[in-house]
Amino acid sequence: RSIGYTKHQKIGNLKKEKHQVAIIQWVSEEDELDDIYYYNIRLGIEKRAQELDYEILRYFNDIPFNLAEEVIGVICIGKFSKSQISDFETLGKPLVFVDSDTLTQGHPCVTTDFENAVQTALQYLKNQGCQSIGLLTGEEKTTDLQEIIPDPRRRAYRNFCIEEGIYDANLILTGNFSAQSGYELIKAKIETKEKLPDAFF
């Protein structure tokens, strides 16, 4: 029989339920091991989430998945096409993109200041006495192959070198973004017996 009060559990006995945040990665689990850039981005996000007491659920864009109902938001890491972004919108969760400029599509994003980073690195090389500087760059596409993503470092490199009077289009080597590709590009350049630049960036 009710006697007019409710018994409450002691606060110390209550276990706080962690909020869940999903990470969707554009690289596959295997490719991430060869891509230290995206690997470190993910680790940084997971570390901060842990500090804020969030539980992280990882998904890979190349594997079909069903998002857990408990997820309160989604962090999308990588380069995604407009079509892929539309698919993510159907998840019905708040979206934040990392390394994609999605402001024009109405989603908050975090991007790298490549212009400043490239200028700082190139200025350092020039201060070390490098008079000719080559660029190792790559061409990326979204995982659905719908959009080509230009390397923002290339424009920053070109602008810096033109301003300094050291631009040479023949010193731009284009492959893909992997250590193996970089190795093969440099090896092929050496084998041409052409004069090499003082440094490659």
Language-model regions, residue ranges each:
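Amphipathic helical "hinge" segments at domain boundaries
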Residues: Y5-N66, E70-I72
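Bacterial carbohydrate/catabolite-sensing allosteric modules
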Residues: K7-Q9, W26-V27, Y39-I56, E89-F97, ...
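Short secondary-structure boundary/capping segments
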Residues: N13, F65-N66, S86-F88, T192
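Short loop/edge segments at beta-strand edges and connector loops
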Residues: R58-F60, G78, T174
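Extended catalytic core of nucleotide-activated donor transferases of GT-like folds
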Residues: D62, G73-G92
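Short acidic/histidine-rich motifs immediately flanking catalytic phosphotransfer sites
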Residues: L67-V74, E194-D198
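Short, electropositive alpha-helical surface patch
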Residues: E70-G78, D151-R158
